[in-house]
Amino acid sequence: MTRSFADRHIGPDAAELSRILEVVGVDSLDALAAAALPASILDDAGAGPLAALPPAVSEHEALAELAALAQSNTVTTSMIGLGYYDTLTPPVLVRNLLENPAWYTAYTPYQPEISQGRLEALLNFQTMVSDLTGMEVANASMLDEATAAAEAMTLLRRAGRSRSNRLLIDADLFPQTRTVLHTRAEPLGIEIVEADLAAAGLPEGGFFGVIVQVPGASGRVVDWTALIAAAHERGALVAAGADLLAMTLIVPPGEQGADVCFGTTQRFGVPMGFGGPHAGYLAVRSAHARQLPGRLVGVSKDADGNPAYRLALQTREQHIRREKATSNICTAQVLLAIVAAMYACYHGADGLRAIARRVHGHAARIAGALGEALVHDTYFDTVLARVPGHAEAVVAKAAACGITLRLVDPDHVAVACDEATTDAHVEAVLDAFGVAPAEPVDAGIATRTSEFLTHPAFTRYRTETAMLRYLRSLSDKDIALDRSMIPLGSCTMKLNATAEMEPITWPGFAKLHPYAPVEHAPGLLKLIGDLESWLAEITGYDAVSLQPNAGSQGEYAGLLAIRRYHLDRGDTHRDTCLIPSSAHGTNAASAAMAGLRVEVVKCRENGDVDLDDLRAKITDHAERLACIMITYPSTHGVYEHEIAELCALVHDAGGQVYVDGANLNALVGLARPGRFGGDVSHLNLHKTFCIPHGGGGPGVGPVAVRAHLAQYLPGDPLESGSHAVSAARYGSASILPITWAYIRMMGAEGLRKATLTAIASANYLARRLDEYFPVLYTGENGMVAHECILDLRELTKRTGVTVDDVAKRLADYGFHAPTMSFPVAGTLMVEPTESENLAELDEFVAAMIAIRAEIDQVGAGVWPAEDNPLRGAPHTAECLVGEWTHPYSREIAVYPRGLGHARAKVWPAVRRIDGAYGDRNLVCSCPPLEAYAE
């Protein structure tokens, strides 16, 4: 029998599924759906919500269709610039990092002991950024340059002394950056003033911050030292956008006095990809480190005193501070940040300088030939030419040679050089302008003299052999899906199939500039159109935008749509967002960013939203009610049977219903939020639809809406007032083929079966583990959704063993831990997904049962509460060969199920890490080698 793609994506075969359903207590998947989901929202299994999807095809057929789409695109030599440049990705990084499941299937490193490899790689990224910008602390990536600028704006406001609501931005910022800044500023009451700051200086009046860019959109390089000093004298802080390649030659903003730097690392080996994904960055002075949004890797020490990496200052994050968080950013761009970091490690400081000099040299040749047509005589890679009335003709002549220039206006053309620019390209550009070659023009820029990238990480791995082994040594320290299931609740760590991943590096997708003429991208635009219609069909909504490049940004875009809808109707008073106490912290943070007040709705003891409290809150805020944000199924892992009534209550009060799509893997093919009461949802393509998590990004968070909100979806970032939320119109377009391939190969029947299998597997684990770790919440008929919460609180009270102990001990058993203490402290949330077979589920069950037996040993006094296999976990190979004073044996420590157990052994790189020490002694760049010798 020929196996379909769905048969290979879904872990349990027919016999295993029969066993799973037997334990769950139902005789079929349809019976499971009827028992678990409310009948009021369940779609008919025959017609189903997926009937309009195309029938499933094989992997080879899907790849052939994708190849045809890619080949229909026109790949030219892009010299458009504006923050997107062609780059030469070293093949060693393509094969061993970008295309390696040991890297792209990992999750965010919340379990640092089994994440030391990518944490070290991210520390390299932070060091690279802080060195090149001249700043002191950088975070572990942002979503793109424009959103990084927006985060810089709010950081300036939080960290500064000024009480003004005015922000000054230089008119030479990238246009997409200006648009996103305006989108973010308006709901927060920030007034943006644009001016040519280089020419006019600072205007009169108060302002809390200034944002400039080096080089500017026109290519102009300005020394901002005097303006920064003047801004500081007036109580304002300054953020500067900085091109990292340019910073190898130009005095960086940090040395000019800037307080914050932001930008993108795209040109460090990451293809343009029609807009993304790329790792943005944000760097600050040490005084502002605790104001940084996103994730920050720091150096701490483990139980044996060895240096160890971890995520630092996590109390800043939205999971804890909710609407008071520094940002709503959760998933960022870890995989792409690591590519950029390894690009810097591979080339080193001298290699990057050489690339920068070559790029600048090509620009200087063009500038010299342009003569008096050159607009700015200070530049790095981009020159602006004044050609009155002839701009379109110049661009057309270059296009005939396969080169795409930037048409600025009828009188001006910009030309951006990059790593891939050749002498032949320069000659073709000069021919398009109708000018003869001439001597290069001195760009007149202040040359950098300070050193950078001096840490051995940037000098040791300059040969392919060294880099290959370095990447392997790092990935060996981590647990990703290539080694084990990752049962993280609310994260949906399912298979990222090779056939889905293969097209992302094809030139027809990877080498397109996001602002290229639309006629260059018919294949990708067809793919995007397919996805928009398929996702609308799956969710029951009427329109979809793929622009948001993370779930957090999809949330934000959806809430902005609701806000603008109310404002257009004259309901300016509707500014209150109701959020259940069980909600993901991102919800509250997104609401605050959208200018909404957050009011928390209580949950009942069974985990459901308390409708009585909801009615009371609606009454209390009737005139001000904007919306409710509800996750469905809930973050408590159950299908709330009163969801339709909840939606009706809010609608009757004039509010909108935002259904968080984080748990859509429990709905696809069964129920549609747009049909059971939702007005808007965001989806997570990196959860439900197979884009890999990449160790913390990339993600894609499309926003789907009913027809009345469609006009409020984000628009083209090159158009002012478009309410764009990302730098590129289609966000992280180059990874959309992954989701397209998944839906195309699964078909309607496969998608529905995947959902039901995920639900069946979660209920199987709940049934098997309930007597050892009580399942905290169940819905009607005792069912859970696609995840379940295991309650350890009574065990902790009785024995002192915590969820942290259990999470660390699971590493000794070869597993990544489930989600800890969310949404309820002292619990573990488990989500197996549809991709794990019965053998893997049973291995996890056996590990958890064995851990329960160890907990009982502690409770019985056999092992002391402070010295037992759980409190000592995880155990490294190094600790085995040292002095052993523990009351349990070495074998129990590292082979808890016996030496003969067949499961591959995972050796954590470090012992348990001291988080508090790392936060008290914050170090966020590569430590000196002496730290490892102490």
Swiss-Prot record:
GO terms for cellular component: cytosol; glycine cleavage complex. One of its GO terms (biological process) is glycine decarboxylation via glycine cleavage system. It catalyses: N(6)-[(R)-lipoyl]-L-lysyl-[glycine-cleavage complex H protein] + glycine + H(+) = N(6)-[(R)-S(8)-aminomethyldihydrolipoyl]-L-lysyl-[glycine-cleavage complex H protein] + CO2. It comes from the Bacteria. Its cofactor is pyridoxal 5'-phosphate. Its EC number is 1.4.4.2. InterPro entries: GcvP, GDC-P_C, GDC-P_N, GDC_P, PyrdxlP-dep_Trfase, PyrdxlP-dep_Trfase_major, PyrdxlP-dep_Trfase_small. GO terms for molecular function: glycine binding; glycine dehydrogenase (decarboxylating) activity; pyridoxal phosphate binding. The modification N6-(pyridoxal phosphate)lysine is found at residue 687. Keywords: Oxidoreductase, Pyridoxal phosphate. Belongs to the GcvP family. The glycine cleavage system is composed of four proteins: P, T, L and H. The glycine cleavage system catalyzes the degradation of glycine. The P protein binds the alpha-amino group of glycine through its pyridoxal phosphate cofactor; CO(2) is released and the remaining methylamine moiety is then transferred to the lipoamide cofactor of the H protein. This is Glycine dehydrogenase (decarboxylating). The lineage of its organism: Bacteria, Bacillati, Actinomycetota, Actinomycetes, Mycobacteriales.
